[in-house]
Amino acid sequence: MNITTLTNSISTSSFSPNNTNGSSTETVNSDIKTTTSSHPVSSLTMLNDTLHNIRTTNQALKKELSQKTLTKTSLEEIALHSSQISMDVNKSAQLLDILSRNEYPINKDARELLHSAPKEAELDGDQMISHRELWAKIANSINDINEQYLKVYEHAVSSYTQMYQDFSAVLSSLAGWISPGGNDGNSVKLQVNSLKKALEELKEKYKDKPLYPANNTVSQEQANKWLTELGGTIGKVSQKNGGYVVSINMTPIDNMLKSLDNLGGNGEVVLDNAKYQAWNAGFSAEDETMKNNLQTLVQKYSNANSIFDNLVKVLSSTISSCTDTDKLFLHF
């Protein structure tokens, strides 16, 4: 089954990548405090393990997002792995913060030498920073790309998936609103009122649903930037509470409603086969637009995870290099 048959497989699924369990975070905080307070050097080991976990989970998430088959199970796995990454990112940031504030236990003579050195040095006019300052910057980088980039896509995919799930329910009901129009088999009877009501309810529910940001509002410039990033046909920039948001573009639903109005009548409408096929082709084209939008978002989310994975790889390498340098420096 590919993305075009998503309607039957995700109608009851719940994609909530930001639904991280609060008690899990508290447990992580407790574990970090207990371990680092009793043995500060272990925070480096914990950080290395956590970054490794992020990469492993992210690789699994990228594999799921690259699949052409999206099922209820795969969507649940995507949500689970997204939440796990968010929790591990939070843990990494805390560990990096601890490393930036606490002294790394080193050789006594080396510590005295370091304390006697200038706090800052100049090399070719560029300011040098300590490893603890570097780790603090790394912590900020991890948080920034997670909060301001990865989670934006998580929320956008979640919101659009929920909308399409509800549209899938309308499609499932459509079969019951179509019946033969006569005994000759040359006409079709369509319950226009029932279909129109379902589409209007869907539009009312999601017309103000934000793809970005998840909460509050942003500037018009920022909203336009993310509309372009997410895909111009997926959303639209609209005003809200004095600011701007990127809302779900409901144009496909609007076009479906217009096509029903063009059939004439608001109750049962009898269409000859040619007219029904023409209407159904237009209706299906709008459905295809929404499917393509969802597929585009999923692909962009996969690309965002690739960028995040590369960042974690670079940060892991940076931390390892710092640690190796410290070991060489203290080996005397």
UniProtKB/Swiss-Prot annotation:
Record has Secreted as a keyword: yes
Ranges annotated as biased composition (Low complexity): 1-25
Keywords recorded for this protein, A-Z: Coiled coil, Plasmid, Secreted, Virulence
Compartments, record wording: Secreted
Effect the entry attributes to changing residue 136 to D: In plasmid pINV_F6_M1382
Signal sequence interval, chain numbering: none
One cellular component (GO) term of this entry: extracellular region
One Pfam match: T3SS_TC
UniProt keyword Cytoplasm, yes or no: no
Reported induction: Synthesis of this immunogen is repressed at 30 degrees Celsius and restored at 37 degrees Celsius.
Positions of region (Disordered): 1-43
Main location: secreted
GO biological process assignments: effector-mediated activation of host programmed cell death by symbiont
Region ranges (IpaB binding): 192-267
Biased composition, class Polar residues, residue ranges: 26-43
Transmembrane segments: none
UniProt-reported outcome of changing residue 140 to K: In plasmid pINV_F6_M1382
Coiled coil: 44-77
Role played: Required for bacterial invasion of host cells. Controls IpaB and IpaC secretion, and the efficiency with which they are physically inserted into target cell membranes. These proteins are exported via T3SS to form a pore in the host membrane that allows the translocation of the other effectors into the host cytoplasm. Along with IpaB, is essential for both blocking secretion through the Mxi/Spa translocon in the absence of a secretion-inducing signal, and for controlling the level of secretion in the presence of this signal.
Similarity comment: family membership: Belongs to the invasin protein D family.
Annotated domain remarks: The N-terminal domain is an intra-molecular chaperone that prevents premature oligomerization of the residues on the coiled-coil region that are involved in interactions with the needle and/or itself. The residues in the C-terminal domain probably form oligomeric structures at the tip of the needle that are responsible for the regulation of secretion of other effectors.
Note: Deletion of amino acids 1-20 abolishes invasion activity, affects contact-mediated hemolysis activity and IpaD secretion. Deletion of amino acids 41-80 and 81-120 restores invasion activity to a higher level than wild-type and reduces contact-mediated hemolysis activity. Deletion beyond amino acid 120 reduces invasion activity and abolishes contact-mediated hemolysis activity.
Protein name: Invasin IpaD
Species name: Shigella flexneri
